[in-house]
Amino acid sequence: MSGASDIPSFRWTQSLRRGLSHYTTQTKGDVLRDAKSLVDGLDFSQVSQVQRVMRKERRSDDDLLKLRDLNKAVDGLMMMRNKQSNVSLKVGGLSKDELMELATDLEKLKRKINTNERSTPGVYQGNLTTAQLDRRSAILRSLGFQSRQGQNNGVVRIWDIKDQKQLINQFGSMPALTIACMSVQGAEQMNDVVQGLTTLGLLYTVKYPNLDDLEKLSAEHTCLQFITREESANNISGYNLSLAAAVKAGACLVDGGNMLETIYVKPDVFADIIKSLLRVKHQERMFVSEKPGMRNPYENILYKICLSGEGWPYIGSRSQITGRAWDNTTIDFSKDVMYGPPPPVKNGGNIRLNPLTDTQEAVIKEAISKLNPDETIWVDIEGPPTDPVELALYQPTTGYYIHCFRLPHDEKGFKNGSKYSHGILLRDIENARSGLLSRILIKLPSKLVLTCQGSDDIKKLMELNGRPDISTIDLSFPTDQARFYESVVWEKFGSLCTKHNGVVLSRKKKGGNSGEPHCALLDCLMFQAAFEGNVPSIEPKPLLPSALVFKSESVVAM
């Protein structure tokens, strides 16, 4: 609950409470109404079964089905349910800088959570038997590694299931459920449970309650004795009576504490909440840490708010929500954003800002739709990102590629680039379709990830064309490795591009041909060959007709 040890976690929590106080609500009445509904309507024999499941060292698909069925029953009995209300944020309610910051933080959070789920208990990671796990624990103890309290002597609890996605949103505690379980399974009066949890909640206004605090408070409130002494961990179900679950329940019972747990999110105030959250983040210099481990307070609230878009992010039932925070809250830069520098307006009247026809736009859209965003897509350009003259996108798994040219604005710089790099002659691209390169970039899918050899120019190109949402994977091969297959690629695929006809000189030696020119398309093929260790075997196939790429080669009317 407290997050990472190297940050002022509770101070961050207090600052978030103050900064988001306008969005907190009084939840005690709603929580108690749902708790009574669960007491009356829930089959607690099923609750006991699920609690036994969560104590097992290895859990199966049948165990997961029991958990999901019970979660569905709980959701049906509760009023405090989170609704699936996916949000797409655009420039307007939030500034472009705020949207960029939010997108970056969600991406970092995605990497952190995915790393945790791959490397920590709770997700199936192998086939160790119980005997092997016990033996491993004994080895660790013999080497002086003491097991922490609540970790069951190192026994790892894993989900041995077919579809790990079925685990998403099936965990996390709900105050109404915690109160109901403590009342029924502990044979306690609900009023006594409320009093004990309220005491924990009041303590939570000044510090994170710990196990020592729990021990002392249990002497006064016997109902607190039912709270487990295990430390909090990932994939703890709402049916585990953990300290974190009890503290969360207590927070909801304290009226006037501006507790984060009582925040209620509605679609019409979603952007305002995010804006306030980012403001507090800057004041306290909060951040998303990509180190594996529990979420810090900023990471926790960011994930919870962005998960459903409507409801109680901390305390409402969310088991019927699909997707993760980064799936359900997306950043859309495709509208209300000026893409690249505006074209000059000539004296005397109207000009078409987009030089392409609607039919040509449709051809581009269809071509891009054939690139699978979940598979590797190479990108390369020739010329500087501020004045590119060639663009190529290539997908190795299908052989599909998009390849186009553009007339330069800076002819002097272009000639220098031709002389020492790409070898393109101006006369060979004088009929290149105006506006095609930028429209291809604009129509690429949102948040696409492109693979490249050297990312600085690609990133700048995307930013200049209004596509900062597109990210890159830079393989950063050494030059010799990157161009190892150069001659083989040119020999096999050189006929794909006939626009590099100039002599290319070496910058290192005075005079003399430096070898093959740099072609954006063939470089993509060459980099893929360097990555795979052999030349691509799938025949490259163009997605754009030459009649669109070059005006003079028109065969059919576009």
From Swiss-Prot:
Top-level taxon of the source organism: Viruses
Keywords from the UniProt entry: Capsid protein, Helical capsid protein, Host cytoplasm, Host-virus interaction, Hydrolase, Inhibition of host IKBKE by virus, Inhibition of host innate immune response by virus, Inhibition of host RLR pathway by virus, Interferon antiviral system evasion, Manganese, Metal-binding, Ribonucleoprotein, RNA-binding, Viral immunoevasion, Viral nucleoprotein, Virion, Zinc
Q: Which Gene3D superfamilies match?
A: Arenaviral nucleoprotein, C-terminal domain, Arenavirus nucleocapsid protein, head domain
Question: A single GO CC term, please?
Answer: host cell cytoplasm
Which Gene Ontology terms describe the biological processes this protein takes part in?
negative stranded viral RNA replication; RNA-templated viral transcription; symbiont-mediated suppression of host cytoplasmic pattern recognition receptor signaling pathway via inhibition of IKBKE activity
- Give EC number(s), comma-separated: 3.1.13.-
Subcellular localization(s) per the UniProt record: Virion; Host cytoplasm
Residues the record lists as binding Mn(2+): D380, E382, D523
Which molecular function terms from Gene Ontology are attached?
hydrolase activity; metal ion binding; RNA binding
Which positions does UniProt annotate for Zn(2+) binding?
A: E390, C497, H500, C519
Site (Important for exonuclease activity) found at: D457
Q: Where is this region: Binding site for the cap structure m7GTP?
A: 54-236
Name the job this protein performs: Encapsidates the genome, protecting it from nucleases. The encapsidated genomic RNA is termed the nucleocapsid (NC). Serves as template for viral transcription and replication. The increased presence of protein N in host cell does not seem to trigger the switch from transcription to replication as observed in other negative strain RNA viruses.
Question: Hey, which family's this protein in?
Answer: Belongs to the arenaviridae nucleocapsid protein family.
Share what the entry says about its subunit structure, partners included. Answer: Homomultimerizes to form the nucleocapsid. Binds to viral genomic RNA. Interacts with glycoprotein G2. Interacts with protein Z; this interaction probably directs the encapsidated genome to budding sites. Interacts with protein L; this interaction does not interfere with Z-L interaction. Interacts with host IKBKE (via Protein kinase domain); the interaction inhibits IKBKE kinase activity.
HAMAP family for the chain: ARENA_NCAP
How does the record comment on the protein's domains? The N-terminal region is important for the cap-binding activity while the C-terminal region contains the 3'-5' exoribonuclease activity. A CCHE zinc binding site is present in the C-terminal region and may thus contribute to the substrate binding and/or the specificity of the exonuclease activity.
Protein name stated in the entry: Nucleoprotein
Gene symbol here is N
